[in-house]
Amino acid sequence: MGAPSPDRTYRAELQGLRAVAALLVVVYHVWLGRVSGGVDVFFLISGFLVTGQLVRATARGRLDLRTLWSRMAKRLLPAAFVVLAATLAAGALFLPANRWPQTAREVIASALFLENWQLASDSTDYYAQHEQASVVQHFWSLSIQGQFYLLWPLLILVVTLLRRSLLRVLLVVFAASLGCSVWLTAVDQPLAYFHTATRIWEFAFGGLLALVVSRVALPRHWGVLLGWTGLLGLLVCGIVLDVGAAFPGYLALWPTTCAAAVIAAGATGSRFGADRVLASEPLRYLGDLSYALYLWHWPVLVGWLVVQGRGEVGLIGGIAIISASLVLAAATHLLVEEPVRRSRWRARTMVALVLVPLVAAAVVVQPTGPREGAAAQLPADATDFAPFDSQCRKSSHSQELDVCYGLTEGPPTKRVVLVGDSHIQQYLAALAPIAERRGWQLIAMLKGACPFSTRSEKVPGDQSCLRWNDNAAAEIIDLRPDFVFTLATRDVQVGLTEVTPPGFVERWRQLDAAQIPVVAVRDNPRYSFSVLDCVQVHGPVPRCGAPRAELLAPVPPYAHLDVPGNVSFLDFSDHLCTEDQCPPFMGDLLVNFDDNHVSATFMRSLSEVVERALDDVTEA
């Protein structure tokens, strides 16, 4: 997705490879919602081309960093700034007001090529995790690319001045970064996905390829075989591998190795070679558009979803999104990229003329209230979690576990532990008034995307979640509360996918052995779109809800399970949905503030309902 790099040893098949990578990214984003590996191909190609260019420049003794960075800025910045400016303007007109602060913040980060660090920070922020994907979220990869363009020439220059072996240095960078990627993906996958250190090896892989590929002359038939193997392997990568929850890590070797195979195969000269297809005029032209296509497709997709108020695009909608993105990409290439590339503008002047007004505009974009046709202004806690008046300390079992004790007047009559992720946190709004009335002490142990289980339910193999759960269970057994409040079910994805995972039941058995009662609540429905976004665009209309039969099975999944005797179940589905529908509003209260969390305002309105239900399953 990096802009094409001018090179005297131009290889037409690389433009076709860019085109394939861009199409994979777009198609997977629009219809499949999965990682395709296309971005990793862009990283490898950039490493290959830039390293080759730098090595040739140093060999001639003509490595001018100022000129190099200026050329790179003229290739990368114009289209990026145009898309950011257009996105900011369109967002102010069409996005729900609640999305403006996030959009402005990320536009600034993207303009400064720091979006990956913004998203990495959000991935470790308990509250930021629940924000909807912004219209410029895809700039994370461009930010890493920009950082690469800034730092890589310095690395090559230092290695040259110190007369070290570039091959050995790149091997060390490759191994260290790949090792970091594998480790951090296992420990904290959301952070690993956006972290620069976990991606540098992909550029180093391309750099290593640039150093050795010219030394290897493959027989034609081997080149044909290698090229097609790489291309076909790339096309099926996202389908064969469930890469989303374990990426980048070692799985990123698949798309990068496939792309490396295509590059190593080179121009075979065979009419049966993959390079002949990739070097065809349509794919080369699409390769020229690949950077702009990548820039445009995501804001067009997000804008479509917001305006339609749904979470899926369908076949016709997807074709429309891709077509619109291609038209915008072609226009940007013709009217922005090419004129700027041919101009004599200095990169410094261009940045000053565009970046400063863009950042200033993003800073002043703030919500000013509901727009015409939107829902009435909502209270703050209708769009967020309820605050919890508590004092937190680190668990004696682990510094990773925060235990938050609700404040009470005098000795508590009961101690109740809430343990799990945000879907348990939302019940604080209902339980806090009960605790205040009855003199209970609420004790919260919460971790985003980490339900109370013996397994990592949402991110397979997440060691941080596994450790946190083990420590939480040990802390609960030490505390011996009157009962534990946790989830009974979870949705694997949108639709009738609700399950009671075996890991939940195993934790209940562990507490049963310690004679600690468990109250397990059925999870609320998960939508394919943000209910709040839909309401703010379209108002409280039925399209912002969903038929109950599409979200909730008539019988909860735990009904026929063999569970320990210490477990009691609660199900508030009839208060979140009517008999036939799960509407956006019940009465005049917004039910959900995103696609899967109940608003604090609505949850607080259920406090007496929750209290009566608890009386039925616990000692009053």
Each language-model region and where it sits:
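Extracellular/periplasmic envelope-modification machinery, especially enzymes
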Residues: V243, V306-L334, E338-A620
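Membrane-interface helix/loop caps of multi-pass membrane proteins
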Residues: M1-R344, P357-V359
